[in-house]
């Protein structure tokens, strides 16, 4: 088990509905990460932007983008996280992939599809949570709109690290900032949020605010950047253990199950 986990957040603009251009761009950005890192986190739908044009852009799970993620993870000896559009059994999914350096991978389908943008009319909602054990860290990943639903992310001491990847628009960025911090505090877990920047072809503007928070809600990244950047932060398991033992907030939680 590793006490330290180095996490790199990679915030970027995206080429609209252009997987080849986005893969090339992220190949260069990942290659330019100078320090060693254990985990690299990309935005939601990093190959296309947040589009409903799934019938044109969807891939099979074993398609080109997953192959690309495996190559990047192996080259950097780091796990790589991001989502893209997957077609499976006549359904489309906004599917997150957690790809390890050895090529093993895990998937999570976005649970809460964004009805305001009619995402629910195009994409099928996921039904299962995902918890990954990576280097002795228990990691629970989510996608964008999931952030607004705290019960879905409720921690019963099952995980150490929350990850949210997003295309979260500038006009609602206050909610993003507030809820990322809240998810860290209420679950006594590190919380990583990676959002995109730029403007998409639906005229949505994005200003990033990617960040990492500790178990008490302290922001560990240097600032809420609004441009394209990466930053690597070292997380410490001993911090989680000591703060949970001291405060014991999770022991006082209500006990219930989701149907």
Residue ranges of each PLM-predicted region?
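Beta-strand-turn-beta hairpins that frame and shape the catalytic cleft
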Residues: 1-8, 131-140, 161
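Short beta-strand scaffold segments in enzyme catalytic cores
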Residues: 82-84, 95-98, 130, 210-212, ...
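Active-site catalytic loop in hydrolytic enzyme cores
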Residues: 87-157, 171-178, 239-250
């Amino acid at each position: 088990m590793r006490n330290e986990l180095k996490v790199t957040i990679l915030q970027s603009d995206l080429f609209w509905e252009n997987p080849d251009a986005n893969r090339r761009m992220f190949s260069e950005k990942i290659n330019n990460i100078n320090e060693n890192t254990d985990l690299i986190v990309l935005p939601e739908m990093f190959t296309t932007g947040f589009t409903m044009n799934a019938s044109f852009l969807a891939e099979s799970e074993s398609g080109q983008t997953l192959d690309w993620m495996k190559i990047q993870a192996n080259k950097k000896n780091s796990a790589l996280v991001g989502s893209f559009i997957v077609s499976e059994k006549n359904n489309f999914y906004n599917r997150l992939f957690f790809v390890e350096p050895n090529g093993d991978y895990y998937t999570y389908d976005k649970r809460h599809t964004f009805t305001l943008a009619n995402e629910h009319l195009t994409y099928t909602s996921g039904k299962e949570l995902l918890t990954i054990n990576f280097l002795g860290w228990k990691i629970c990943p989510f996608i964008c709109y999931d952030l607004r639903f705290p019960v879905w992310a409720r921690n019963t001491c099952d995980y150490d690290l929350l990850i949210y990847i997003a295309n979260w628009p500038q006009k609602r960025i206050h909610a993003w900032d507030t809820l990322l911090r809240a998810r860290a505090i209420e679950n006594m877990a590190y919380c990583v949020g990676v959002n995109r920047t730029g403007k998409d072809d639906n005229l949505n503007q994005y200003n990033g605010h990617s960040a990492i928070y500790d178990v008490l809600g302290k922001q560990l990244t240097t600032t809420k950047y609004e441009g394209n950047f990466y930053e690597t932060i070292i997380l410490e398991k001993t911090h989680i253990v000591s703060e949970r033992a001291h405060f014991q907030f999770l022991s006082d939680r209500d006990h219930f199950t989701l149907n």
